[in-house]
C-alpha cells in the first residue's frame, strides 16, 4: 500500500512513498510543456502544462506514479489493497485509462477546482497499457475468478 501526506502551514506540502519491494525503473521524469500526450480514447493533447514526477517510461509514454505541474497542482496514483473498478467506454464522457489519469489532470488543470471539474466528467475506462502492463484487477473479474 502506498502512503501520501499533505502538510499545510501557510503553504501546501505534498509527499508520498512508493511501498514497492521491487525496482520498476522509476525515475524523476519531466514532460515538457506542449509535448504531445497521446490518449487511447481521447484526442491527443498538443498544448498543456509541464509536469514533473516519479514515473516509468514505456514506449515513450510516461506512466506517472505522481507529479506536479507548473501551476502547482499535484496528485498521486495510490495503490490500495483490493481490486479496482473500471467502466466501459461511454459516449459523452472523458474516457481515460487508469495510467492516463495523472498526466491528463496535471496537463490540463491549473487549480484544484479545475481538476474537480475534469474529474466530474471522467470515466476510468477498462484499458490496459499493454499485454505486459495491465491495469489493476477489476473487482468484477476478481469476484468471478475467486468463485471457481
Regions found by a protein language model. Name each.
Residues 1-93, 126:
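A contiguous strand-loop segment
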Residues 60, 97-98, 135:
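Short, glycine/acidic-rich beta->alpha junctions
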Residues 142-148:
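Conserved small/polar residues in nucleotide/adenosyl-binding loops
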Residues 91-123:
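Alpha/propeptide regions of enzymes that mature by internal proteolysis
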Residues 71-73, 102, 137-140:
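Generic beta-strand structural signal
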Amino acid at each position: 500500500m502506498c502512503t501520501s501526506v499533505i502538510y499545510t502551514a501557510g503553504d501546501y506540502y505534498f509527499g508520498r512513498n512508493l511501498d514497492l519491494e521491487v525496482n520498476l525503473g522509476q525515475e524523476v521524469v519531466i514532460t515538457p510543456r506542449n509535448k504531445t500526450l497521446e490518449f487511447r480514447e481521447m484526442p491527443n493533447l498538443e498544448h498543456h502544462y509541464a509536469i514533473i514526477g516519479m514515473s516509468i517510461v514505456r514506449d515513450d509514454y510516461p506512466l506517472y506514479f505522481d507529479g506536479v505541474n507548473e501551476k502547482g497542482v499535484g496528485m498521486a496514483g495510490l495503490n490500495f489493497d483490493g481490486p479496482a473498478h473500471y467502466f466501459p467506454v461511454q459516449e459523452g464522457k472523458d474516457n481515460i485509462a487508469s495510467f492516463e489519469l495523472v498526466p491528463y489532470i496535471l496537463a490540463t488543470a491549473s487549480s484544484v477546482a479545475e481538476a474537480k471539474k475534469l474529474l466530474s466528467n471522467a470515466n476510468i475506462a477498462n484499458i490496459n497499457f499493454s499485454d505486459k502492463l495491465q491495469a489493476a484487477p477489476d473487482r468484477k473479474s476478481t469476484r468471478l475468478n475467486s468463485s471457481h
